[in-house]
Amino acid sequence: MSKDEIKDKKRKSEEYEVVDKKKHKKDKKDKKEKKDKKEKKLKKDKKDKKDKKETKSESESNEDNESVASVSTSSTVDGYTENADLLKVPQSEIDEFFTTNEVAVEDESKLNLRPLLSFSHISLDSRIQAEISKFPKPTPIQAVSWPYLLAGKDVIGVAETGSGKTFAFGVPAINNILTKSGSKPGKNGIQVLIISPTRELASQIYDNLVILTDKVGLECCCVYGGVPKDEQRTQLKRSQVVVATPGRLLDLIQEGAANLSNVNYLVLDEADRMLEKGFEEDIKNIIRETKSTGRQTLMFTATWPKEVRELASTFMNSPIKVSIGNTDELSANKRITQIVEVIDPFKKERKLLELLKKYQSGSKKDDKVLIFALYKKEAARVERNLNYNGYKVSAIHGDLSQQQRTNALDEFKTGRSSILLATDVAARGLDIPNVKTVINLTFPLTVEDYVHRIGRTGRAGKTGTAHTLFTEQEKHLAGSLVNVLNGAGQPVPEELKKFGTHTKKKEHSAYGAFYKDVDMTKKAKKITFD
């Protein structure tokens, strides 16, 4: 082999070697890239799998949360949990309850809480539970309002007197203290304040609530005028629940004897009556002394007239309105038989003696009869006349001391006296059991008061009779009375129709017969009382 051939062979060999190296290098690079690509793909697949798993887990978690939230929306509201057995009650049964009891609920927040058809549907302090369970079942106003009150909502309760309103606001009030104060409920001073228009009604509310407060170790006191203040000052210092009339309470506030800064549960009972008696400014001044935030406010009353709505809108926060029966239009209890007799005014007292013989003869001799006069002087005269004719009569009117009025009510309630003679001071709110007959000796100044008077009978599902003596002097009220009689399906005497059926709109002393309609769905404006 020539030298050139050897050289050429060596050159080619070197070229092949370079090519091999390049190829090897390329193969190595390709292999590395392939490996990297595979690793990237594995990482991506792994990541995708992980993300998919997390997404699925999150989705399942969200579904679970939505499911829980759905249950929570229907069963738990602001600390109030609907009972499991209550949730199982068919909707048809709930609808029947609302229809049968003529229940209407205005609730802009759409909570739709179910009424408590049984005491077993509510969870309270065991001592309270034991006390209320002595009754067969909650009354309609209790059944519907308790869930909203236990959920901390402001509530307007409108129902006829004798419907269980005192326990409707009283049971949640006392449970509220026990829940918020724990083992030391007495450390926070006055926490529940109930304002009532009259001394008699305040005393009645106190008598009902003290049964509960005694059971759970709370102090309750009743504050009203006509008696010395010394004992009331002492009681206010140690009480957690206070029932009061506006005038006396304001006096004690101004003296520094009543500290309302911890009141978180405020009740206005018979609010319309308090406005009629001119207590609006007193009420505002009292409210100013309570907590401005975190206060639960309630109105419980037999009627809900337009003149009260504006007041409610100033200090209630999106209230739930619970109405039992027809409350926007004046209506009488349909369980009461109404008899209206048109008579000469000079023959009324002789007629009264005839009626007492009729309603208290034979087996009815001990039946309770409540007689209404219009003025205290008239009441005093009629009382003397009845005593002269051999009747044992108890009386309540403005010329009597508070102690005399309290004794008279006690005699009538316990049966030591079967006749109670009263002016309209006793017409509103008083719970006098088993009154068989109401006699209106003199017709009241308004038909509203007539409805409240006759509402002293036919209470708590019972029947009763109201016998009214109507004279030409009241003919301007004939039209309104006819409407009430027709609304309750009662007969209207021809003599009454002769006075005409025109209805005069009720007038306010300041605003006349023109009221502003108030939209209660609007949120209350926050105001500061100066």
From Swiss-Prot:
Sequence ranges of Low complexity compositional bias: 67-77
Q: Which parts of this chain are annotated as the region Disordered?
A: 1-77
Q: In its keyword annotation, does this UniProt entry include Lipoprotein?
A: no
Q: What is its main location?
A: nucleus
Which GO cellular component term is one of those annotated? Answer: preribosome, large subunit precursor
Composition bias of kind Basic and acidic residues appears in 1-20
Motif annotated as DEAD box, chain positions: 269-272
Q: Which reaction does it catalyse?
A: ATP + H2O = ADP + phosphate + H(+)
Q: State what this protein does.
A: ATP-dependent RNA helicase required for 60S ribosomal subunit synthesis. Involved in efficient pre-rRNA processing, predominantly at site A3, which is necessary for the normal formation of 25S and 5.8S rRNAs.
Residues the entry annotates as binding ATP:
159-166
Q: What is this protein called?
A: ATP-dependent RNA helicase DBP3
